[in-house]
Amino acid sequence: MYRKIEKLGFIVSIIFGLSIFTSKAIQNLSGSLLLLLMFIMLMMNVKEKKVWNNLKSKCDKEISIGFLVLLLLTFIVFIINFDGKTSMARDITRYLTFFPLIYFIDTEDKIKKFLTALGASGVISLLAALGIFIKNYNVWNRTDGIVFYRVTFGMDSLAYAGVISIFMIFIFSFLFFMKTTTKEKILLVLLICLGIFILLVNRGKTAYVSFIPALAYLCMIKSKKALLMLLLACLVGFQFLPTQIKQRATYIV
């Protein structure tokens, strides 16, 4: 029975990974199902505590404490603002999902499959956003007033910029620190170009105040030369950005 639940848990984990950048509804449903499966396993083995001990052995102590702190902060926010009840429930579900994911994705092969699903989700999202940009280019291209059309997919523009920034950090990490073939490097570079383009046409502040500092940190770890190249790319590249993007940048400060 345990094996069947573990197998089902891994399948749901893959679905969860595929939905991260593509569907909030499926993400919430699969995340809740993961928690339910984890709860069932804990209850079935409540006396022997085998599942609980396995979970503790697989979780990094410091990271687990970090997630528990996030849960505590969420409760504090809820106490201050009672109107955020629904939002709090979603946040708690997302934070707690970390633990069943750690339990069900417990081998190198499973990790690779989950990362593949996560990457596929990001690629689908970027391509969909590109299609939306092409379809609505005339609206995006308007420069009158201070209301700017922002490209997004499946969520509000601010949240989308945030998740794509996180996805891009993963892609840069693979490029900088993982051993990859020439074809894989080309694919990663193409994804980086597409991701940066989507972040720019999204016209959100996230690309400037979150993504760039995080990327600068990765470059600093990689080498001083990489960090210098990033700074030059930002300074020089900004001068060549279209007016439609530069105008949005003036509202960041």
Predicted segments with their positions:
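Alpha-helical transmembrane segments of multi-pass inner-membrane proteins
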Residues: 16-17, 75-76, 93-96, 112-142, ...
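Membrane-embedded alpha-helical segments of multi-pass membrane proteins
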Residues: 25-47, 88-99, 160-168, 208-216
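Membrane-interface amphipathic/re-entrant loop segments adjacent to transmembrane helices
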Residues: 86, 135-148, 152, 252-253
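Flexible juxtamembrane loops connecting transmembrane helices in multi-pass membrane enzymes
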Residues: 149, 239-253
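Aromatic-anchored transmembrane helix interface
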Residues: 63-72, 82-106, 122, 126
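Transmembrane signal-anchor hairpin modules in multi-pass inner-membrane enzymes, especially those
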Residues: 1-82, 109-119, 175-186, 225
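Juxtamembrane membrane-interface segments at transmembrane alpha-helix termini
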Residues: 42-52, 101-107, 127-134, 203, ...
